[in-house]
Amino acid sequence: RDHISKNFKIAFGQHSGIIDINKNRFELPRFPINEKYGEIKRFKSIINYYPLEYKNLEPEEKKLSKENNPPKFKVNFFENQKNIENINCYSNEGDKWMKSNIKLVDKELTIKFREPFLPRRGRVNCSVNDNGKWRWFGAQFIVD
């Protein structure tokens, strides 16, 4: 972390999402646009997404080992976030994408993962339809 913060102004992750003022500038999300994910229909869709902003996300440490995999995942949303009770999350725990086991209480979302993430990368994507505006956030973990 020190090397990155001393030598870079920003860094992008390998997770999908929309940048907002609350995101860690060294873990910025992005949607890939390339030969595999570059269809015009998809592009038109993602440029109309909005960030799903949150106060904080745990764990702060995104590097996972045998001791902390699966992680204890918690997100605290801002009080003014509407329709958060309609949130859907998906994760690639166990190396297969599936709907996450979520619990939402008073704007705090927790995910109980069924399996550990497999080496290289674990990801979580959450979205909510906020009165016709699709809001999205993603998180990634580096897995040893």
Task: Mark where each language-model region is.
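Conserved, mostly hydrophobic/aromatic
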Residues: 3-4, 28
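A generic structural signal for alpha->beta connector loops
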Residues: 7-8, 25
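Acidic, His- and aromatic-enriched active-site or binding-groove loops in soluble protein domains
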Residues: 8-17
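N-terminal start-of-chain detector that recognizes signal peptides
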Residues: 2-3, 46
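Terminal accessory/targeting
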Residues: 17, 21-25, 30-144
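Short, solvent-exposed polar/charged micro-motifs at secondary-structure junctions
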Residues: 1-2, 23
